[in-house]
Amino acid sequence: MIAVKNVSKSFDGNQVLKNVSTIFETGKTNMIIGASGSGKTVLMKSVIGLHRIDAGRIEYDGRNLPDMKMSNIRTLRREVGMLFQGSALFDSLSVLENVMYPLEMFSLTSKEEMIERAYFCLKHVDLDEKAYGLAPSEISGGMQKRVAIARAIVLQPKYLFCDEPNSGLDPKTSLIIDQLISQITHEFNITTIINSHDMNSVMEIGENIIFIEQGEKAWEGNKDDIFHVDNEALNNFVFASELYKQVKKANQ
């Protein structure tokens, strides 16, 4: 569990997060949604530790991130998996080597065990073994995302952060990626946090949802309630997301 308590953050005198509080639960897909510029990305980066907050607490199972010593932060880094918007794979490495990379970086085990662990994770995301020796540029975008997921879980993380995981993917592939993230979250009991503006993803796998508007938590709840909320900003966001989806579908 990650508890965010009264977190505020400013850049050059501009307050982009204002006393945000929420709980990201273990074993559930927690989603941060909001329009561009709302502060949702700053919130995620603050929770990860990429931005130092001005006020508040970010507690990883009771451990307050801003108070941690560097040695404790290094330990925490091994507990965190990251799924970036653009997959962020190394094309100079094979698919298998990309998944092994975090294990090599932390020197946690033998070469044989690294390979075994990487194979386990790649099989877990249903990637064809024929792709293991290929460079990322030689496989499809959807397959690249599977590799990125495998790499994100290879350290057996307690916490998984996903930044717009469906960016650039077609609807069918997006659904597959959503289902993989949800499956991994529940099977391994991970605290998963997803930064997204994709309402399809929200309705498919969102369990705890926090809506950020102008740096504040404007609404929090579950997907069953999201279309029945008396909140103008949230309603406008949902409408805009649905409109964008229809326009995109019509142009395909």
Positions of predicted regions on the chain:
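Helix-to-loop junction immediately C-terminal to a conserved catalytic motif
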Residues: 48
